[in-house]
């Protein structure tokens, strides 16, 4: 069986001493025994008439490229001589898949729905000739689909540098759009390799050094009729950088991109995952999400994103390497496709409250459906990506909370969030175990300002000790300062403090307005000024700022006041604590008329000075006239000791609650770090209120 289109093949035919020679041709040679006629591209592959001595059959193949048609004719010749009939040959040829990594098309995980998606093809083309052939093979299909042809390509490091500009020129000349990215840079700088490629291109190309992001950007930015060629790596399942190989497969990233584009969403929790979602199998210090694939499948998950395939699970899996890093890359790529007015919120204290205030303002401005905000405190390297992945083209404004407890974390989060406005709310004594000094905290939170665009706006308190540092980090970008000084861009005066809130006049560059804030404490008024400054920075009218602040209500665990049946207040500030936030909360408690009790749990992550810090807040409670201090846990006991008479330390929650009940009626403030779980005290008090109410109602009915 010989190729009649090849000059050497024709010579073999003429010289062959075989009893029977079968010639095949894609050029329609009448002398050939097996021919491809009426060869043309379709939307999903090639169509041609397979002509043999037995007759003709129409063939649709997902293989692309004329060379693959020739390969099919060769196979047809072999099968024919083995005695297969034409209809059987046609069925088999139509079902053949490409060799891995050679013009191999990629499909999404099947979700049972029909979606119009671009065609994605992976090819190993890493030489000029191979790249030219691959693009040429796909051009006719792009034309048949009435779409564009996009090429994502790069060149390997430590290899022939002369071919780089040549390949760049081929891609620019033959494809409609090109994204230049990394291949296997090996020991070379990827940016230098990209520069070499760009030298052969007539115009400056689109560059995305992260290959995963380049693939996501290409697939998500394409029209359904488009064809995308991912060239260079083909079937490879790794990427080599500086001598280290990490798991990377173009086909897996393209599969995820297509599956996401079908409308799939992500979940990291098998307890809450829903049908059709993708389970991201994160690996932590205690649990490995890869061990929970069967649970995800039982909940109806469509597939799992894993670091490496778990063959024991039947759940479809997409292998993206380190899943935590994959989540960050996915979120960064998704964020780059959306352009809402985005505000990032950092700081030691008040982040979540200020974020909720801003969210209330944004809702007043553009409505619920057009605004996005961080849910709860999902502010780490899992929560921030999940929040960004909720972005849609309908969102006009967003506020994202960025949290940290180690150096370098804000850099990671700000890099994917890419805000237009960034707030540093304050710098206080938090995470001292890892950051050691308040200045280190100020620098870490302030690092968000470096990720603002040149047109971005930095927002921070003008009277903070580190205001000059934040101005320096802002570089030449515009700055908005807030606080109680009349020289600041956003400030307040005519302040009237009430037990459950504050009223004041707020001054902004837009003008002045009366504001009623339904949250107690001067620190919450500061948060409101920060929110107003951020909102002004993204263009929110003053009337919407006022409406949004008026509509704000404290969230559970964050200075959330609620009335007790005895007429006193329970202030739930149990979400978190550091020395400065405890002092601010004590100030609020001290302003209330009547007996007051502080219930304090341990303050976590405050470093070697923990004992002194707890003693400090205990002494401050005494100084401010708080009537009693009850503490829970060994660390918090230092606060009770410093408080003196009226300070009681407990290690048992039930004993503390009984003592608290015995000392009521009184205003009660409950505060502590997450690790102290002081919300248990709040729940116990609420349960007690409910029990007392039921008893009263029962006595009334008996009477």
Indicate where each model-derived feature is located.
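Phosphate-binding loop of NTP-binding sites
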Residues: 2-4, 10-17, 52, 73, ...
